[in-house]
Amino acid sequence: MTEYVVLVNEQGDAIGTMEKLEAHEKGLLHLAFSVLLYRETDLGKEFLLQKRAECKYHSKNKWSNTCCSHPRVNENVEVAGTRRLNEEIGITGVLPEQFVNLGWFIYQAELENGLSEHEQDYILIANTPDVSFILNPEEVSDIQWWSEADIEKEMKANPDTFSVWFPTVYKKVLTHLQQVN
């Protein structure tokens, strides 16, 4: 099945659609979302990170947020987040209304293979203490709960371990969680 992305302008207004790979080849601004699930433990918050599969056409073998993708045409980002949690890691217990939508940011980054990310990226979070998962090997090679300390340590020591968008997503999530606690 050919996948399409929703092209947007700098204000976030939809202006068309394009095949996903072509949009990444041309570096055109399009809608995306990043889901980051977290849980509270006795030692603090932990975040569920995925390691992107070796077969992904960009950012392969990089640690990133729980899941990320692009909403389909006329698909709400929270519904898309729920859909991709199921498709990527087999999580079915998170409903669209459980997400807190932190809004969006725009970023652009050159990737390997001559591709470019240029996304209006919505950040969706949910506190999910008890989730089970089944990895889709075409999407994800590993999944782990990471403490704040472990993420910070790895981002300082080995920043290339993570996808280019993850540090921004993570910092925005931390800022939000610190403000509400």
UniProtKB/Swiss-Prot annotation:
The active site is at residues 68, 119. GO terms for molecular function: isopentenyl-diphosphate delta-isomerase activity; metal ion binding. Its cofactor is Mg(2+); Mn(2+). It comes from the Bacteria. One of its GO terms (cellular component) is cytoplasm. Binds 1 Mg(2+) ion per subunit. The magnesium ion binds only when substrate is bound. Binds 1 Mn(2+) ion per subunit. Pathway: Isoprenoid biosynthesis; dimethylallyl diphosphate biosynthesis; dimethylallyl diphosphate from isopentenyl diphosphate: step 1/1. InterPro entries: Idi_bact, IsopentenylPP_isomerase_typ1, NUDIX_hydrolase-like_dom_sf, NUDIX_hydrolase_dom. CDD domains: NUDIX_IPP_Isomerase. The keyword Repeat does not apply. It is an enzyme of class 5 (isomerase). It is found in: Cytoplasm. It catalyses: isopentenyl diphosphate = dimethylallyl diphosphate. Catalyzes the 1,3-allylic rearrangement of the homoallylic substrate isopentenyl (IPP) to its highly electrophilic allylic isomer, dimethylallyl diphosphate (DMAPP). Belongs to the IPP isomerase type 1 family. This is Isopentenyl-diphosphate Delta-isomerase. It comes from Aliivibrio fischeri (strain ATCC 700601 / ES114).
